[in-house]
Amino acid sequence: MQVPRLKLLMGSGAMFVFAIIYGWVIFPKILKFMISKQVTLKPGTDVRELWSNTPFPLHFYIYVFNVTNPDEVSEGAKPRLQEVGPFVFDEWKDKYDLEDDVVEDTVSFNMRNTFIFNPKETLPLTGEEEIILPHPIMQPGGISVQREKAAMMELVSKGLSIVFPDAKAFLKAKFMDLFFRGINVDCSSEEFSAKALCTVFYTGEVKQAKQVNQTHFLFSFMGQANHSDAGRFTVCRGVKNNKKLGKVVKFADETEQDIWPDGECNTFMGTDSTVFAPGLKKEDGLWAFTPDLCRSLGAYYQHKSSYHGMPSMRYTLDMGDIRADEKLHCFCEDPEDLDTCPPKGTMNLAACVGGPLMASMPHFYLADPKLIADVDGLNPNEKDHAVYIDFELMSGTPFQAAKRLQFNLDMEPVEGIEPMKNLPKLIMPMFWVEEGVHLNKTYTNLVKYTLFLGLKINSVLRWSLITFSLVGLMFSAYLFYHKSDSLDITSILKENNKVDDVTSTKEPLPPTNPKQSTTVHPVQVPNTLIPGTNPATNPATHLKMEHRERY
């Protein structure tokens, strides 16, 4: 029976081509198509439900820089800072008043963040610790008036002395009062200067202040924003074009901002940071619009990583160097004058929040070294202060992330306000926050068993097919190689069979008498084609064998 060499060759070749095309072309396209149909913000989908009401809290950490030498700093000395924290909160995110536009393939919603103190995770801290910070109303207010409304300085200075009697440049208060419960602002005075100062509270210009009665307000960094509207977004649903999933097209019902000098900086780029499109390329980066900064920030690919045994991509970001990057000059006060640009690694938030605040990475990580040298107590490092995201590109899933941001006061002396006239000019760290998420196995298993299991099966299948096809190709090549020698091999086999037949037909020799001497003569065998079997040339055939009887 002959082996079908041609069929084996063709079958193995076809298997090899199929493994390549299916494993690297067809299957990935099928998988991407299935993901694109599932990962949308269409009502009724699992992704829509998870996106609109996150079923687990994010971890929110607050670290405060306690000023240990406030009196010396008030006289121009170098600040000494002590980091206190973390104060831990559970941050719940939800979206309400959702409105779909099927024609535009968008959904509009209001974002709401709710912070709940986690005393167990905060231990040994309690939140009742007293912290010394730059006065959160006097210093920003005095600096803003000096820069923008210097003619009103005398009126403001008198009003501050009435609303905050005996106030100093630095305020000592409990952490929870500073950040959530609020510090008291007394606007009960009938003095004209006090009433003029309190106007900004009554009109709502001070967004961090909450009115508790007709004459009193409570000011806190985050209390007013807790469980309140964080802005109305309009984003793409990704039904018609999956690549636009989550893309911000409007914020506060505007298609672009009107904050920065140049239009490019006012453009919305990326998502609302709670959802990303699947199938991104690593060089695309991860872009998100951040209302707190009135700016879109992009994270860039750093290196490969893994999370719970699943491969992912590590992304990171920083504030960049606005002065050195021409594309970022629109974040300068005057894009034509680079001297108005903030230092490397910082961003001026005055146009965004209306006060002399600067944003940076914690501890001025990746910022101008001079900023670190201006104060004592900072120790920037990548592990604790870098922003990172471990992201799975195909499904668009962030496995874990840490968004870190530091808020600083752009401090300077104010001649018209007595407690502030000798302050040093520097960028003063106040506090920094970290918003983190680490998906547990309940959610990572959804990706693991729907995506990575399919990828693993495809990998095993395609490499198995390639292995079998290569074995088949090698075996068929072996058969074709020996095809030219088949005649010689057949002849040899036939002659071997002839020799066996001749040997089997010989008559047996008569038994020898042990008492007689016997001479054995060789039998003449016809010459064969097998070399070495010709008796005429074999010396063994001339040997004479004798048996003698022993007595």
UniProtKB/Swiss-Prot annotation:
The keyword Transcription regulation does not apply. It is a multi-pass membrane protein. Pfam families: CD36. Glycans are attached at N66, N213, N226, N440. Keywords: Cell membrane, Disulfide bond, Glycoprotein, Membrane, Olfaction, Receptor, Sensory transduction, Transmembrane, Transmembrane helix. Residues 528-540 have a biased composition (Polar residues). Coiled coil: none annotated. GO terms for molecular function: scavenger receptor activity. Residues 29-459 are extracellular. GO terms for biological process: cell surface receptor signaling pathway; cellular response to pheromone; detection of chemical stimulus involved in sensory perception of smell; lipid homeostasis; pupariation. GO terms for cellular component: cilium; cytoplasm; dendrite; neuronal cell body; plasma membrane. Its main location: membrane. Residues 1-7, 481-551 are cytoplasmic. Disulfide bonds join C265-C330, C294-C352, C332-C341. Belongs to the CD36 family. Plays an olfactory role that is not restricted to pheromone sensitivity. This is Sensory neuron membrane protein 1. It comes from Drosophila erecta. The lineage of its organism: Eukaryota, Metazoa, Ecdysozoa, Arthropoda, Hexapoda.
